[in-house]
A protein has these predicted regions:
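N-terminal secretory signal peptides that target proteins for export/translocation
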Residues: 1-10
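Sec-dependent N-terminal signal peptides
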Residues: 11-20
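Eukaryotic scaffold repeat domains enriched in small/polar residues
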Residues: 23-390
Length: 390
């Protein structure tokens, strides 16, 4: 069996340290999408007031205190719907709240029958439906906006690799999937392929589209076992309803991908001063992999990934950078749909909120509002909504 470890572990409860992956299938091909020339931006954006400090105002708080309708153990997978409502995933829960924070329903029903699931990997709120993806059994479950079950669509993928739903548009679902890289010999840095899959809503037909390689440190074993530490990941967010804004490299590079055309329509970056990571703690060094009785700790990296997360709204793509200041917060770069570096600002939030802004899936941008998961010192969770006026 193969094990995959995120190199940078979250500082709150997560899934067990190792995620088991079955090593099957062939190595995904290179990024096939044809791109235009990379848009090169200077270190400073066009906005005259770039670099200002923005302090969001707390609008509301959702907690599990005083309710038996739901509980927060590890809320994640935050998504907003066109009506401003919020959805998220937790243990045996798919929770929906309206834009004012009022609890609507839990759509999770355990089982293998119609409308039932054993676990959920993603939820996709769209204009007329609310859709959840269950990896086991692999299917898409449709609900109306009132939370009533409508139907389900089996996803008959030939691969057993993990699939993550990214986007639904024009009758097609788009997923990210990955394969464990085939390697032999000493531990090494390798490309780990992440492919985009298109699944037809009408027929369930699956088509493999472009692949976006990420970087991983892989340990192999002559016995067939092995594992890897993810160094970069594919971060992809819906942009203008039908596109994906994404990044998958350690150095600064963003892309706008049209999955319907299977084509990168824009690549862009800006001059960026790279940030060194904090040294590994003794606890981190002791963690890692045990392969054939030998311990492998996470590799020491020279730099952090330049772009830690992506958010999008209207014609803007927000790149959450690795640049952080104790007094100012995190530096956010703002690009338009043409790849032009328009603006930048420091996002100043409580430290618990900033941790969620860095990690994909733990925050969601909806117009002037930012939903964020926060963990308090007493180990409890809350979801907060902030008004962000830039």
């Amino acid at each position: 069996m193969r094990k995959t470890f995120p190199l940078e572990k979250y500082r709150w409860p997560i899934l067990p340290a190792g995620i088991l992956l079955v090593w099957i299938g062939s190595f995904a091909g290179p990024d096939r999408a044809l791109a235009q020339a990379i848009v090169e931006n200077p270190a400073k954006p066009k906005a005259a007031n770039a670099g200002r400090v923005v302090v969001p105002q707390e609008a509301l708080v959702i907690s599990d205190e005083g309710t038996s309708d739901y509980y927060f153990k590890w809320p994640r997978g935050l998504k907003t719907a066109p009506d401003g409502s919020l959805s998220l995933i937790d243990e045996s829960q798919v929770l929906r709240f309206d834009k004012s924070g009022k609890f609507l329903q839990n759509l999770f029903k355990k089982g293998q029958g119609p409308g039932e699931v054993n676990n959920v990997s993603a939820c996709l709120p769209v204009v007329k439906n609310f859709i959840i993806h269950s990896p086991y059994p692999n299917k898409l479950v449709f609900f109306d906006l009132a939370g009533k079950y409508e139907r389900e669509l089996p996803v008959r993928s030939e691969t057993r690799s993990m699939m993550t739903a990214l986007l639904f548009h024009g009758g097609t679902f788009y997923f990210e999937t990955r394969e464990f890289p085939r390697v032999k010999g000493d531990p090494d840095y390798v490309d780990s392929p992440h492919s985009i899959l298109a699944v037809s809503e009408a027929t369930g037909e699956i088509k493999t589209l472009s692949a976006f390689p990420t970087r991983a440190f892989v340990v192999s074993s002559p016995s067939g076992g092995g594992g890897m530490f993810d160094i970069t990941s594919l971060i992809a967010v819906p942009f203008k309803e039908r596109l994906l804004a994404l990044t998958h490299t350690s150095e600064y590079l963003l892309k706008i991908y049209n999955p319907e055309a299977d084509k990168i329509i824009r690549e862009f970056r800006r001059a960026y001063e790279r940030v060194k990571p904090e040294p590994l703690t003794e606890e981190q060094k002791k963690g890692g992999l045990i392969i054939d009785g030998k311990h492998y700790g996470p590799p020491e990296l020279k730099f952090q990934n330049d772009v830690r997360n992506l958010l999008a709204r209207c014609d803007e793509i927000w790149a959450v950078t690795s640049t952080k200041d104790k007094a100012k917060g995190i530096l956010i770069d703002v690009f338009d749909g043409e790849g032009v570096y328009r603006d930048s600002f420091w996002l100043k939030l409580p430290e618990a909120a900033l941790k969620s802004v860095i990690y994909p899936g733990f925050c969601a941008l909806d117009g002037d509002f930012l939903w964020v998961v926060e963990r308090s010192e007493d180990e409890t969770f809350a979801v907060k909504k902030y008004r962000v006026v830039i």
